[in-house]
């Protein structure tokens, strides 16, 4: 929360309800401040936990890289790893669906940006 305040990030109720996603928002600003990252890298960092509508290819790649990284071990992850090399959008759709299903299974609401990303991606395939 301190970094969000430092960088002037306005957190909405969905952000506050999903604290594990906040590092994406603060990390993007940290990377810009300390490393001068350009807009496309800033955006890829910023949206790597929730996704967003109209994601660029780099944003999708970073989202999926985080979702399927080698230490992840959950049912279906290997299928998404394989799919990511064949169809980036299809892999994103499956990853977002799995993520949102898991959040719902735990009794929480998926982040609205994830739902927006999923709806947008479904119109792209």
Regions found by a protein language model. Give the residues of each.
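Divalent metal-dependent catalytic cores for phosphoryl transfer on phosphate-bearing substrates
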Residues: 1-96
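Charged phosphate-binding loop/patch that engages nucleotide di/tri-phosphates or the phosphate backbone
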Residues: 101-125
């Amino acid at each position: 929360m301190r970094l969000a305040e430092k960088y002037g990030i306005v957190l909405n109720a969905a952000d506050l309800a999903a604290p594990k996603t906040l590092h994406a928002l603060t990390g993007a600003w940290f990377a810009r401040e300390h490393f001068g990252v350009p807009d496309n890298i800033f955006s890829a960092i910023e949206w790597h936990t929730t996704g967003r509508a109209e994601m660029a290819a780099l944003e999708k790649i970073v989202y999926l890289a985080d979702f399927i990284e080698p230490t992840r071990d959950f049912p279906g992850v290997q299928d998404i790893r394989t799919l990511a090399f064949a169809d980036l959008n299809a892999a994103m759709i499956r990853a977002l669906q799995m993520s949102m299903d898991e959040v719902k299974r735990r009794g929480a609401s998926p982040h609205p940006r994830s739902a927006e990303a999923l709806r947008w991606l479904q119109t792209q395939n």
